[in-house]
Each structure stands twice: as structure tokens, then as C-alpha cells.
Amino acid sequence: MAVALTEYRIETDGKFFRRNGQRVWLRTVTYGPFPPGKPASRTTEFARIRETGFDSIRIFTLPDRALLDDAERAGLTVFAGLNWDHYGDFLKKPVRLSAANVRLDAWLREHATHPALTGIYVGNEISSDLVRWMGPAPVREAIESLIELGRNIAPHLLFAYANYPSTEYLEPANADFSAFNIYLEDRDAFTAYLRRLQNIAGDRPLVVSEFGMDSLRNSLETQAETLGWARQTAHQEETAGFTVFSWSDLWARGTSEITDWDFGITDRDGNEKPACNTLRKFASSPSTHNAKFTVIVCTRNGSERITACLRALGRMTGNPFDTIVVDDGSEDGTAALVDAEFPDIRLISIPPSGLSAARNIGADAATAEILAFTDDDCEPDREWLIRLEKAFQDPDVAAAGGPNLPPPARTPAEAVIRSAPGAPSHVLLDDTSAEHLPGCNIAVRRAVFQAIGGFDSVFRTAGDDVDFCWRLSDAGHRLAFVPGAFVWHWRRPSLRAFLRQQLGYGKAEKFLLTKHPVRFGKNGEARWTGFVYGGGAIRAEDDSVIYHGPMGQAGYQSIVNRMLPLRPIDSAFRNPWTNFLLALVRILQPAARRWARNRRIRFGFTKPAAAESPSPVREFGIAGTDGWSRDHCLSILLHAGWQASGNTDPWDLEKGGTRVLVAAENLGGGLTNCLFRVWGSHAAAIALEHELRAAQSPDESLPN
């Protein structure tokens, strides 16, 4: 019986996905590409996939309508793949990228409205050496251009790029979710890397777009066990979905069947492996902890905001909790509104006393073991407390919090403000520990709160959370970061209100500087030990320093100067005017804070650094077959006395002042074109080319 998919589609929901208003966790399996004529019956295969517990398939091509129809009948959604020629330098030969644009455009115009289609992967694992060759920023911009094209045609679909650890810095800014192909067979390493990727993903959902194990080199039982714990771990670590690679051992590159690996959970004859039964039994782990929470919301003149906040709390799932609203001398009827519309919520009205005092009064009235604070302009996610509760299962955790995400912009001003610096942000010491958690999303053990004296009432409108977290850290307590425990936090509605807020933050920083002078620099800016969260996915820019490893061969390559980027302007509002406004705000925001803090204005202009690297003197390519590869070329040069690069050098080898970068293009049919970029003298570059052409034979004897 067909399952209707026409009424709703999958959408992003903060760090997760939802369908028809309900949170969904994607359970996906890759399907194909297959040798010609196989499998025999797609209809039967799709029914088996659904019965095994998957709700979606990922394919590596743009499918025909028949496949989409079969998926719809089976109750499966489809993530299609734009398979284009990114196996060579598509910047030097832009026809490759142009062809991808034309193909995506034509396919979407024909198939974008199909009810089974959920999303598009616009690329998959562009080779790290080619990314290094073309430059991370231009490659990322090319990926972003494909996403932009697709979104303009089909804004209802999800768009992403399937990344992998060797280019984790290549995250497109405009993707709907971050996707990583991960093959880590150690559970602890897999867990740690997912936690890292949550912060690389920024505000958006994280999906494991491939995870698999070869049962040819491992036992069937080991494959089943590994896939079982990997999917369970991905769920526990708050990803938005998990993709098993792959459904079948049948696999082809072009028309050639691949027989030297068995990643499928069914064999080449269609028989189930033990992994199918393991995956069929998957269930989320229930919480074994029953911590009691009191949620404290402080408000002043919040009548236009607090209803949405309290209704969001009313939709909260999990164990019962108490809610206390502290009305800090409102003059707009806030207290009467809360009393009339939310009679089950405890309301405490006080004369105007300031935010810190209001929070302390709420804490004094609470009886639960954990105090959770949020603001009247926030709407906590329905799973907020459940996810915070898991953090407190660790007895060493004194406080915990998650991201505060801006809701989608409704106006151009909101679009600019949600992309501007200066919003309340968490600061991370590592992937799971925080130096600072904003007061709009922080929970703390009541005993610890009382032990350090709560919030300092000298801070009336802002800065109290910074002081509170620093005092927690100074007392030796751990602050945990929980990426899935998010609240929607409305930013200021206008640029005037936003800059007025920044002046208030600057005034608060005056008190912080007096109280914590060692935590500030000579110009009055806070000196954080960790990284300030900006909301955008971590991605390389033109001036980024990237750890590639010697000769660019590190399996995990990352940005060294990890300045966490801000969110991009929503594409619906991005135009020259909003780009100009954002550039202006990025100048005025720190200036406003500096004026309020120091009573002086100093705009943050810096003189661009002069380029240090000379231009290459020669580029050339040498094509070959039967073992001609980048690794082979590097071996030739190492044998000839060339020295390997350092971890962050933009070249691979050096000899006598001459440097060379090597990349490889896969031209198909077993043909590889090795690319060489040379710095130094023209004579040395020509000599290098002659040396390589002379040694081109892959049968050349090389030392071990």
C-alpha cells in the first residue's frame, strides 16, 4: 500500500528536521549505482528497504521519474545526487561547472515537485588535493553557486554538499544542513568526531551522509555490530540523521562492476546480512535520569513577547517541571497577561530591580535541583530540557546550555541583524566544554548556584551571565555544551534597537572589566580562552591557515586559525542594499560597544597584509595510466632528494629553493593527469618537468 507523501515535506527545525510539525530523525541507506541490469526488481528492493526500518534513500545520481514513483509507493523519500565532473580542475575548465549548472537546472525544472524528492547533494567528496590546488574558498564558492541555483528553482527542497574529514573546512555557507561521510570504526573516535562536527556545522543540522563497513575484510558479525553502535551513537550525539553505506554489495563505477569490497547490508544475490536485523531493531535510548527542573523566565515590559515563550514551554516534552515568571516592574500589563493566560505558572512581581536581581529571586523561589534560565524573547525547543538533562547525568557538570538560534528573518532588517556580530553567544573551550553560556539558555545545579552566590545584582540589563560563568569556572566547575538543546531567540527588530542593545552590552562590559580585569585586553575587549560561536558553519576563507599535514596527506584536515564565522544573510533578503547594511553594522557594532565601555570610538579597520607568497613560475600536467598517480609522483621526487612540506604549507615538496604542489585529475578510463605548480626559477621548473616525464613509467624501481 502506497504511503502518501504529498501533504508535507521534510524541513529544517533548528539543529534537526521536522515533517508535518513532528521531529524526524532520518534513517537513510545509499542505493546504487549498480551494474547494468541490476537489481532485477526495484519495487521489491524498495519494499525491503522500508521494512528494514529506513525512511529514505540516498542515490548518487539525478534519478528518472520512475525511480521517484517507486520510492513514493514504498513510502521512501529520496536524496538525489548531482554527479558532475569535479574530478578535475573545474576552475581552469569552467565548462565542467557550467555543465553541472545546466544539468541541475534542467532536472529540477522537471522533477523538483515530485512528492518523494526531499533533497539534493550538489557534490560528494571533492578530492582534498584538488581543493588545495584550486583553493578552498573558490571551490566552496562553486559549491555554493550550485546550491543557490537549486534553491532558486526549488526552495522547498533541502540542499547540501557531502563533505569528508580531509576537507572539513569546505563547508558551504548556504547549505541547509552539514553532511559528512565518516568511516571511523572505533566508537570513541566516532563519538569525539561527531562532537567536533556539531560545532563545525554551526546553527544547522548535522547528518552522517555515509557510514559503512566492508564485510569482505571484516566479519559479517563485526559489520552488524559496528553499524548498530554507529547509528545509536549518531542519535545520542544529536545528529539529524544517519546514512548506511550501502544497501547492496552490488556496486559499479560507470559500467564496471566493483567486486573487491562488500559494504552492502545485502549480498550480490540480494540475501540479507546480519546487519539488516541489527538495524531493524534500532530504537532510541530512553533517559534513565529524572532530574527535576525549574524554568525561570524574567521579564520587563514583555507583554508582546512572553506569550510565545510560555506557550513554547507548554509544549515541552519529558518529565514535569515548574515554571516561574519574575516580572521586574513591568508597566505594560505583562503581569496581568501572565496571570490571566497562564494560571498554572507561578508569577512573582517585584519593583524594578534589574535582570540579575530578578533571576536571583526566581532561583530563591525554586525548589528543583536544576535551575534553567531563559528570556521572554526566547522560545525553547520542545526537547530543550530533555537534552539538558542528559548533560547533568555527568556529576562533574555544574552547568549546561546550548545554542540560541535566531528564527528565520521576516524583514530585511532582521536578516541583517541575525548575520551581524554582537549577539549573545556561547564560547567553547573544546567541543563539549564551554567558557561562557548565555543567560537565555543556561541551566545550573541549584546547590552550585547557591554556593557561588547566584548572579551579581550590579548587572541590571546584561553582563550578568558572563560574570556568572567566569565565577563558575574560577571555582573549578565544568560548563557543558549541548548542541541539540537550543532555544529560538528573537533578535532586535530594527537596526536602531540593535545598536542600542550593543551600547547596553558595552556598559555592562565596564562593570565586567572592573570586576575581572585580567580577562580584558588593553583596549577593553574581553580576552576569551575559547572560541566565540558565530552561528555560521566553519569554513575556509582566502586568508585561512589550514592544517593539511606533510604533503597535504593528513586524513583529517582543519582550519588552524579557527575564527568562527557568522551566519550568512538569508538568500531571500540578500541584495546589494542588505550587503551594504551588514558591512556598515559590522563597523558600527564594535564601535558602539567601545564607546559605551571606554567613551572613545575606534573603528576596527585594519590595513590589509601584503601578500607574502610569490607567484608560481610554471604549471603543467602529465597524464598517464597503470599506476600513474599523485602518490607515485611524490615518491619519485622524494627519492630524488626533495623534502616534504610542513603541516600548513601551501606546497608539497621543496628542493634548493624550488617548491612544487601536486594534484591529480581523474580523467576516466584509467587515465590520471597529474598537475604540478612550481615556485622558484623558470629553469628549475623546466628541469623538474623533464625529470618527471623521464620517470613517468609506473614500473620505475623505487625504494620501499
Map each language-model feature to its residues.
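Aromatic-rich peripheral "rim/lid" segments of glycoside hydrolase catalytic domains that contact
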Residues: 245-292
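Short, flexible, basic/aromatic active-site loop/helix in glycosyltransferases
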Residues: 402-403, 417-435, 450
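Short aromatic/hydrophobic "clamp" motif used to bind/position activated sugar donors
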Residues: 371
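Conserved donor NDP-sugar-binding/catalytic core segment of glycosyltransferases
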Residues: 383-414, 478, 490
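Short, acidic, metal-binding catalytic loop of nucleotide-sugar glycosyltransferases
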Residues: 311-320
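Active-site mouth of glycoside hydrolases
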Residues: 11-14, 18-175
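Glycine-rich, basic loop-to-helix element that forms the pyrophosphate-binding segment
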Residues: 350-366, 428, 432, 440
